[in-house]
Amino acid sequence: MGQEQGTPWIQSTGHTSTQKEEDGQKIPKLEHRNSTQLMGHYQKTMNQVAMPKQIVY
């Protein structure tokens, strides 16, 4: 069961990766904008979660 689920997932990921590369070349601005927004949100969330870790570090 695990192997059956894993095979299509790998294929799907590979296909998406290939498409993403082509899309990225066509519209890098859009992808970059999305990436920046995602990173900002991710950093905000990480800051809240990692704050106690930072103090220990």
From Swiss-Prot:
Q: Could you tell me where this protein is found in the cell?
A: Host nucleus; Host cytoplasm, Host cytosol
Listed A to Z, the keywords are: Host cytoplasm, Host nucleus
Record keyword Cell membrane present: no
What ranges does the record list as Basic and acidic residues composition bias?
18-34
Write out the biased-composition intervals (Polar residues): 1-17
Q: Work out whether the entry's keyword set contains Disulfide bond.
A: no
Q: Name one GO cellular component term.
A: host cell cytosol
Q: Where is this region: Disordered?
A: 1-35
Which InterPro entries does the annotation name?
Flu_proapoptotic_PB1-F2 (IPR021045)
**What biological processes does GO assign it?**
symbiont-mediated suppression of host cytoplasmic pattern recognition receptor signaling pathway via inhibition of MAVS activity
Main location as per UniProt? host cell
Q: What is the role of this chain?
A: May play an important role in promoting lung pathology in both primary viral infection and secondary bacterial infection.
Q: What else is known?
A: Is not encoded in all strains, and seems to be dispensable for replication.
Describe the family membership recorded for this protein in Swiss-Prot or TrEMBL. Belongs to the influenza viruses PB1-F2 family.
Name of the protein this chain belongs to: Protein PB1-F2
Q: Which gene encodes it?
A: PB1
